Amino acid sequence: MPRVLQILQHALFITSTALLERIRRKYSHLVFCFFKPCDRIIPKKEGKVMDTCVIFCAGEFDRLIQPIRRTDLVIAADGGLRHLTQLGIQPDIILGDFDSLGYTPEGAQVYPVEKDDTDSMLALRHGLRRGCTRFVLYGSLDGPRLDHTIANLQSLLFLAEHGAEGFLAGNRYIATVIKDSSVSFPDTATGILSVFCINGTADGVRLSGLKYPLENGQLSSCFPLGVSNHFTGQAATVSVKNGSLLLLYDRCNGLVQKEADHADL
């Protein structure tokens, strides 16, 4: 008789566990709404130092600017999972409210549709908590939602304020923000470079090696003085002593490297 009881108890345990798992899967979106596990600091993968975070958003995507490295943290933000699927790349994290994708992928971190952060911003916060300092966002600059494009441009300033650098990689252009720092372009750079003040005023602005140079100038967010500058076949530099600048340039020039913070420019 004790043996029969043991068998019954074991069967009951298995049944209960399976039932709980089914409930967890079916109502996982409610659990994530309240507990939001991505607010926790997620440990880095064993032997994988992640300084670059590559995020795929739901906007239009053409091709990669550079290969994704094994050490990159790859995040699919909602509909950005489609792009990764086409590339045959398995993301480290899948998150969002999935109103764009239309279904909830297995293992995804689910958020409510009504929230303060966009799915892209959720991904950025993830990357920052993982210690990433460089962010590349695909599907973030081209698409039918102008409001999301503007939100993504603002997120570049958010990254700069948190000591990180970010790039929106579009099908034709790349956007990035520098704060109290400088960037340089090689003499092979071509096309247009537009420079905007993204927050109030920017002082001590220097544009060199461009068709329209500027020395110790001031740019304001209420007047687009820096629009449509041009590379000239010389090495070019954009720097700002105090403030934040949004740079928009041709995609063929690749990702630039921020050079200095609070430097004596």
Can you name each region flagged by the protein language model?
Residues 109-130:
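Short phosphate-binding loop-to-helix
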Residues 13, 27, 32-35:
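Aromatic (phenylalanine/tyrosine) cluster motif
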Residues 1-11, 32:
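N-terminal amphipathic/hydrophobic targeting modules at extreme N-termini
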Residues 22, 38-41, 46:
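Short, positively charged and aromatic/hydrophobic N-terminal segments
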Residues 158-174:
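Short, acidic/small-residue loops that bind anionic groups at enzyme active sites
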Residues 50-104:
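N-terminal beta-strand-loop-alpha-helix module at the start
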Residues 146-157:
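Short Gly/Thr/Asp-enriched flexible loops that form oxyanion-binding sites at enzyme active sites
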